[in-house]
A protein has these predicted regions:
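Active-site-adjacent structural elements that line small-molecule/cofactor binding pockets in enzymes
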Residues: 1-282
Length: 282
């Protein structure tokens, strides 16, 4: 996460691009409720290294889209990713314009990672008026509404959760037909959502095992071929440097590592390590 206690985001973007790293992804948390009913990571303990309260970075991360726009303004090749955008907490009409503006101003460098939020983060969603029980259906409709706004001169959408009559909305994204949509998540039906609503899958690697992840990558690509889809891009999120060979063997197209918040020199050392790793695996 990029916070007000770490490296300046514009310096970070320039250095990442200068090192030849392909992309940068930013998370999306608008706030942290003071009172929360669930433990960070949820009952399954999906973040075993950070039990209990949320890490400090969650409280201090900058706005995702504002920061990506600023990063795009000081770079020319760096891809700008939402990792992920919690679309159930954002108005779809406004979000479509914000994302299209970033893509248009950056000459087509946006990667739109999407997610429905986690149930352990229920209070944050509730403060935005989102019902955690219907968040996945809401996410699906908002993705399709955004896609419609991006691709239609007069866009309209009529669903259960999103409903609007014809509208004009510019700019349109620079990328045609639109920026790649990367579906986050690891649940039992996520592959269905990838095939129905996205161009790629963005699973998190949350433990030390690989069998389940590898099997699902194979399944996803077999299903994509069977239904005539183009190859599905796989971006491993929350990747671990020590496992890079396994990610390559499984056929991952991209690995996103978590940049620790710390002194600037430590950040630069971490970036140099990632850049060296990227050069070795090309």
């Amino acid at each position: 996460m990029n916070t007000d206690e770490g490296i300046n985001p514009l310096d970070l973007a320039r250095e990442v691009e200068d090192l030849g790293i392909e992309s940068i992804f930013l998370p999306d948390h608008s706030h942290v409720p003071v009172r929360r009913s669930a433990v960070y990571g949820g009952p399954r303990g999906i973040f075993p290294d950070s039990p209990g309260d949320m890490p400090r970075e969650y409280y201090r991360n900058r706005d995702q889209l504002v920061t990506l726009a600023a990063m795009g303004a000081v770079t020319s090749t760096l891809k700008l990713g939402t990792g992920v955008c919690v679309v159930v907490q954002r108005d779809p009409i406004q979000l479509a314009k914000e994302l299209a503006s970033i893509d248009e101003m950056s000459s087509g460098r946006l990667l739109f990672g999407v997610g429905a939020g986690a149930p352990w983060n229920i209070e944050e969603m509730s403060n935005h008026g989102t019902d955690v029980r219907t968040r996945t259906a809401l996410m699906r409709e908002r993705i399709e509404a955004i896609r419609t706004i991006w691709t239609a001169e007069q866009a309209e959408f009529h669903g259960t959760h999103v409903d609007f009559d014809p509208i004009f909305s510019w700019p349109k994204p620079s990328r045609t037909p639109h920026p790649p949509i990367l579906m986050g998540g690891d649940g039992p039906t996520v592959l269905d959502r990838v095939l129905a609503h996205a161009d790629g899958w963005m699973p998190g690697h949350l433990d030390e095992t690989f069998d389940g992840l590898e099997d699902r990558i194979v399944e996803l690509r077999e299903r994509a071929t069977a239904c005539g889809r183009d190859p599905i891009e796989v971006t491993i999120y929350l990747g671990r440097i020590t496992h890079i060979e396994e990610y390559i063997r499984m056929g991952a197209d991209r690995v996103v590592f978590t940049l620790p918040t710390g002194p600037v020199e430590e950040t630069r050392m971490f970036l140099a390590t990632v850049a060296d790793l990227a050069r070795q695996t090309v």
